[in-house]
């Protein structure tokens, strides 16, 4: 191995090597250890439908930061990885591939052959996903990797289904469901995305059967009129009291339907009368149930009109809409049209408009399951970070309807329901029955449908640990500690995991839900294929390194909020890594002799604190304070604040200050002091690497390998940073007096540098400083005087007692506890300043003249908006004040030049 880090920071030189070292040495493996506390995160399983996107990179980085943090704290930290079969999404992809490569439909292949190709897809893309996770630095326990359709998960799914069925919580019924005509399957309510779109309301007259005027009804879906079975009005709506109980005629169709009274219609909306089509609207379905109305379907599962639509049979629903409205208009039934913004439900996968349809499907009764999940949040057993997402969680549970869990697909967990083909007996069993439980026939057929993907994902936190078996992993690692997830799948996944866990294990699946936002592009738009603004994390890693990407993501996001992906933030993160690299090279170089052996260092454990210089105590106290802050913010999931504090500590305090101060000692003649300086450098650098490791694991581990090793640890025989111990805050490492002294000196240095920059004076130009201190501060400044002079290039510091003693013609700056004055004669190049001020005067005179000209123009003052006129008046005042100051300054400088 080389004796020092490479001269140039290039993550490609070591990131893959470091990851292979970790994995081959079992650094990610979590043991069931009664002497340690467990910490568990289950990875939200990415779909096997392609490669990871930037949202996955964020999600996984946050989880890895927490896992590495807890591992360093001494927990047996398990991050359990896996992937999701993603029933609809994967089937769509596989069907598309078969069409393109084989020119076939899935029905041409048959179920068995199709599933072979789906499993081939899983092998291909599942492997790609795990490779991408490894590139990111995910410290998952790959020995426990799971898949939502592996044998263990399938066993858990069947067990859960049968358990709910036998409790009466799963049933099969003919109910209204969401149907995607494109995917050819039912969808749960959570899988329907609602979006407001510009639409139309058509107002049609339904004539009274007795020859009266009847009633006018507004609808946004006239094509469903063929399925109308009633007109509903509110019982308190006086306009329609005489119509209730009578019949009206369905226009052009001629069928009579009743007018009924029901609380559903809103008298203030439309005409107050609502057409009731139970087979094609969920609200109408509920009305139909209350009034025992017939369910008439006029649209088939391919979104085409059926025989109930008469001459429109076979037409697409939207083609029918146009033709039907045209015919109604020509027949005189269309009263008016009205443009409206209408909420439209779309399939979350293909974005086809969903059709409410009556269908025989499997459902989960949700009322009983939802109650414990609601109580878990209200009692504090389950907390959300940030807290506001608890309202979202509770709202969804309190408004929940029965969950449609059957899907008309082939890829997924097949429903464990079996039908006797001879007597029709239904059997729900964990394993396929050999014969009918009623008639003994062996002619048995399994239900063709598969389960909703989220049914198996709902069991993920405990099925992955061996449930329903009482495994050692389940006993030790469950319940898990935190679920890290985006706010976009609280409905889909989080809620279902909670009620499933409470029903099966009696415990919440995790104690905390850390909710993060989305990664948007630089303009704040959601990343998508259609916009072409998606960013491949692997390309970013190739260009900047995984550490830079991870640090940018963790420090750029706050819980629950979206973040914008900006290249300059990546550049900043990479620059930070480069700064740490170069500082570490300097430290390592000064630890070694000419032969590459480590020089002697003081033993800080037994060292008399008197041997430490003030700057040593200051940096040790700063690391100690940072340890406390970073630990506390990490525990609260404020990862951005923790990462930023690590950045400030390393860049601003260690690199910019401590290293610069300590250089003189390292190059000096006092050998004992050198030993102390080396020891402090090593201690501080090691502690900072520990603090930064969860965020930037690769660079910190690489630097760690070049530093002196401590005593061998049974838990970490090879001395890897990933298995080290997290720093612990100690009151003994607080040095308030020395910290005050150094920080006062640093503030003074920064103020002098700012004065130099303002005066355009070179750093090499020696200056004198006059300081007016606040009460009790002069001794502090004097004690730190030796730290000020060299970095600020100050030859002399003098102290004054009051403002009356301030020299004439100075530039000044204020810092906490003191005011600093630099004589103009020291800092100013009067010839250059004279030239600058003359130019500034000329420019300001021009601005004053321009504004005065505008304001003296009566046409401008009378015609321009009052706001614009006031703005110009304000500009005149500002420019005149600036000109007066420049003229005063010019007079002083002119005297100096003369």
Give the ranges of each region predicted by the language model.
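Short acidic-hydrophobic surface loop/beta-edge motif
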Residues: 202-209, 246-251, 345-349, 418, ...
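Short Cys/His-rich metal-coordination motifs, predominantly Zn2+-binding knuckles/fingers
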Residues: 183, 253, 350, 421-423, ...
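Structured ligand/cofactor/substrate-binding pocket environments in proteins
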Residues: 55-67, 74, 83-84, 153-156, ...
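Active-site-adjacent bridging/hinge elements
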Residues: 35-43, 65, 101-105, 130-137, ...
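N-terminal, positively charged nucleic-acid-binding surface of large information/translation enzymes
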Residues: 1-236, 260, 277-290, 294-309, ...
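Feature 926 captures the class I aminoacyl-tRNA synthetase adenylation module centered on the KMSKS loop
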Residues: 203, 395-455, 459, 503-546, ...
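Glycine- and acidic
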Residues: 1-5, 44-52, 111-115, 140-147, ...
């Amino acid at each position: 191995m080389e004796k020092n880090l490479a001269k140039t920071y290039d993550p490609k030189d070591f990131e893959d090597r470091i990851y292979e070292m970790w994995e081959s040495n079992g650094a990610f493996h979590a043991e069931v250890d009664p002497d340690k506390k467990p910490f568990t995160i289950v990875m939200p399983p990415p779909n096997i439908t392609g490669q990871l996107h930037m949202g996955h990179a964020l999600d996984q980085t946050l989880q890895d930061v927490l896992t590495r943090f807890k591992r360093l704290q001494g927990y047996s930290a398990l991050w359990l990885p896996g992937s999701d079969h993603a029933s609809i999404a994967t089937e769509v992809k596989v069907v598309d591939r078969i069409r393109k490569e084989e020119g076939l439909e899935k029905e041409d292949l048959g179920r068995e052959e199709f599933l072979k190709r789906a499993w081939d897809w899983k092998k291909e893309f599942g492997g790609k996903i795990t490779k991408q996770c490894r590139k990111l630095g995910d410290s998952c326990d790959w020995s426990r990797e799971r898949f939502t359709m592996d044998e263990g998960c399938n066993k858990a799914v069947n067990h859960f289904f049968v358990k709910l069925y036998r409790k009466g919580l799963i049933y099969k019924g003919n109910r209204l469901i969401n149907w995607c005509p494109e995917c050819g399957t039912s969808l749960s309510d959570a899988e329907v995305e609602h979006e407001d779109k510009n639409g139309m309301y058509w107002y049609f007259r339904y004539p009274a059967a007795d020859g009266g005027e009847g009633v006018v009804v507004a609808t946004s879906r006239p094509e469903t009129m063929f399925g109308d079975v009633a007109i509903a009005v509110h019982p308190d709506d006086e306009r329609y009291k005489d119509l209730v109980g009578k019949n009206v005629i369905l226009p052009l169709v001629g069928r009579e339907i009743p007018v009924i009274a029901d609380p559903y219609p809103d008298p203030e909306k439309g005409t107050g009368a609502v057409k009731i089509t139970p087979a094609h609207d969920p609200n109408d379905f509920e009305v139909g149930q209350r009034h025992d109305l017939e369910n008439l379907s006029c649209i088939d599962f391919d979104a085409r009109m059926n025989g109930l639509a008469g001459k429109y049979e076979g037409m697409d629903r939207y083609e029918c809409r146009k033709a039907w409205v045209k015919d109604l208009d020509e027949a005189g039934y269309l009263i008016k049209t009205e443009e409206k913004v209408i909420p439209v439900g779309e399939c979350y996968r293909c974005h086809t408009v969903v059709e409410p349809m009556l269908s025989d499907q499997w459902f989960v009764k949700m009322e009983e399951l939802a109650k414990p999940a609601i109580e878990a949040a209200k009692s504090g057993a389950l907390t959300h970070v940030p807290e506001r997402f608890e309202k979202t969680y509770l709202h969804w549970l309190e408004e929940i309807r029965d969950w449609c869990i059957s899907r008309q697909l082939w890829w997924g967990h097949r429903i464990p329901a079996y039908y006797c083909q001879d007597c029709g007996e239904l059997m729900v069993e964990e394993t396929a029955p050999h014969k009918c439980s009623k008639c003994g026939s062996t002619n048995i057929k399994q239900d063709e449908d598969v389960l909703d993907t989220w049914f198996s994902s709902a069991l993920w936190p405990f099925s992955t640990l061996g449930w329903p078996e009482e495994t050692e992993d389940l006993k030790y690692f469950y319940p898990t500690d935190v679920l890290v997830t985006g706010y976009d799948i609280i409905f889909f996944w989080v809620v279902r995991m909670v009620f499933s866990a409470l029903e099966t294990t009696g415990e919440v699946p995790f104690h905390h839900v850390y909710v993060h936002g989305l990664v948007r592009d630089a303009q704040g738009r959601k990343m998508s294929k259609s916009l072409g603004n998606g960013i491949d994390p692997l390309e970013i890693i190739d260009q900047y390194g995984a550490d830079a990407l991870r640090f940018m993501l963790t420090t750029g996001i706050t819980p629950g909020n979206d973040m914008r992906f900006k290249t300059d933030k990546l550049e900043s993160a990479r620059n930070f890594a480069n700064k740490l690299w170069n500082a570490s090279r300097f430290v390592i170089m000064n630890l070694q002799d000419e032969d590459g052996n480590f020089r002697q260092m003081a033993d800080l454990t037994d060292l008399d604190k008197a041997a430490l210089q003030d700057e040593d105590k200051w940096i040790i106290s700063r690391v100690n304070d940072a340890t406390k802050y970073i630990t506390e913010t990490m525990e609260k999931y404020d990862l951005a604040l923790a990462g930023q504090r690590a950045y400030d500590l390393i860049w601003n305090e260690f690199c910019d200050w401590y290293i610069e101060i300590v250089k003189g000692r390292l190059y000096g003649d006092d050998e004992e002091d050198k030993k102390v300086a080396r020891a402090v450098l090593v201690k501080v650098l090691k502690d900072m690497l520990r603090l930064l490791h969860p965020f930037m694991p690769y660079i910190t581990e690489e630097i760690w390998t070049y530093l002196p090793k401590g005593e061998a640890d049974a838990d970490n025989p090879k001395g890897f940073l990933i298995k080290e111990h997290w720093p612990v805050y100690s009151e003994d490492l607080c040095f308030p007096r020395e910290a005050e002294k150094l920080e006062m000196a640093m503030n003074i240095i920064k103020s002098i540098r700012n004065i130099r920059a303002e005066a355009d004076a070179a750093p090499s130009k020696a200056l004198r400083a006059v300081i007016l201190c606040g009460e009790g501060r002069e001794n502090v400044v004097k004690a730190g005087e030796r730290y000020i002079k060299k970095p600020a290039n100050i030859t002399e510091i003098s102290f004054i007692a009051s403002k009356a003693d301030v020299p004439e013609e100075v530039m000044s700056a204020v810092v906490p506890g003191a005011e600093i004055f630099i004589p103009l004669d020291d800092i100013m190049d009067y010839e250059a300043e004279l030239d600058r001020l003359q130019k500034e005067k000329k420019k300001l005179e021009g601005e004053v003249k321009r504004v005065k000209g505008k304001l003296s123009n009566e046409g401008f003052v009378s015609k321009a908006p009052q706001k614009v006129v006031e703005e110009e008046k304000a500009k005149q005042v500002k420019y005149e004040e600036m000109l007066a100051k420049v003229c005063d300054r010019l007079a002083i400088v002119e005297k100096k030049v003369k």
